[in-house]
């Protein structure tokens, strides 16, 4: 196997906003992308009709209202971090939005520690994210 890198041009059947699906990097708009790769590396691209926006999050009690400016359907990963800084896997969730809007209620337990919780909302393609606070 030859590890030498070479430039490869990828031509897609449609034009759109191109993302590197392995890193979340936005590569631009069009129907082609050129990358330098070796046989030891892989590439995976996504062509979307619209560019993915950073999520807009509003907190009301323990409920998150999540939307994006473009109104695109997308998927968000929601992570909850305790006041001690530990990610709480039991509250990690995926949220599929319709028309760019979705809602997630965090089902905190009565035994959860009091304090400020950080909620990280991540758009899964572009990996753009925002942080929100919820106080118990």
Give the role of each language-model region.
Residues 73-75, 101, 114-116:
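Extracellular Ig-like/FN3 beta-sandwich strand-entry sites
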Residues 1-59, 72-76, 83:
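Carbohydrate-binding surfaces of carbohydrate-active enzymes
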Residues 77-94:
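Short amphipathic beta-strand segments in non-cytosolic proteins
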Residues 96-107:
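Aromatic sugar-binding surface patches on proteins
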Residues 61-70:
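Aromatic/hydrophobic beta-strand junction motif of beta-rich domains
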Residues 35-37, 108-111:
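Short, flexible loop/turn segments at beta-strand junctions in immunoglobulin-like
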């Amino acid at each position: 196997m030859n590890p030498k890198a070479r430039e490869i041009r990828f031509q897609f059947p449609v034009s759109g906003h191109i993302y590197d699906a392995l890193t979340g990097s936005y590569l631009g708009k069009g129907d082609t992308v050129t990358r330098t790769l070796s046989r030891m590396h892989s590439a995976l691209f996504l062509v979307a009709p619209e560019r993915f926006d950073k999520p807009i999050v509003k907190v009301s009690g323990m409920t998150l209202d999540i939307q994006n400016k473009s109104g695109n359907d997308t998927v968000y990963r929601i992570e909850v971090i305790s006041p001690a800084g530990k990610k709480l896997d039991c509250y990690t969730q995926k949220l599929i939005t319709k028309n760019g809007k979705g809602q997630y209620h965090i089902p905190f337990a009565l035994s959860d520690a009091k304090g400020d919780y950080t909620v990280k909302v991540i758009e899964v393609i572009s990996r753009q994210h925002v942080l929100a606070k919820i106080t118990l």
